[in-house]
Amino acid sequence: GKLLLLVEPGTPEGYGVLRGIREALLRRGAHVLAPCPHREACPLPPGEWCHFSCRIQRSRLHKMAKGGEAPYEDEKFTFLALSREPVPQRAGGRVLRHPYTGKGYVKLELCAGEGLLQKTVSKREGALYKAARKARWGDWLFF
């Protein structure tokens, strides 16, 4: 199947553009590959938007143009990957925020097939706890 990948700035406006495109293409039979794990309406409440961050190295010219000294920049973006072909629903969910790691537990905010989830994973959950500790914003966590 063909893949359509759309990327916009990680702003409310960029997210709004992709949310509208997502809704229109789903009505025409497209299938979401990422970041959403479902075909339902976005579960994020008004005022929040789905976005991710990627650290990129700055060139000398980039540093001069931005007037910055740091050798990197954290670029925020939002994206949408769609296919014409159906995709199987995966167990788990996409990590929407930086996980909070406490003593013996990890708290995560996830977008999953059943909507928005607040999940706490304890040390007693073994392999899932190890995966949750390593999970980063934007990762897929199987559970």
Predicted regions, residues:
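Conserved beta-strand signature within the Rossmann-like core of class I S-adenosyl-L-methionine
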Residues: 1-13, 31-35
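Charged, low-complexity, helix-prone segments enriched in Lys/Glu/Asp/Gln
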Residues: 1-2, 18, 68
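Surface-exposed, flexible loop/turn segments at secondary-structure boundaries
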Residues: 12, 40, 87
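Active-site-proximal structural scaffolding
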Residues: 14, 18-19, 75
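Conserved Class I S-adenosyl-L-methionine
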Residues: 17-41, 46-59
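C-terminal lobe and adjacent flexible extensions of AdoMet/dcAdoMet transferase-like proteins
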Residues: 52, 56-143
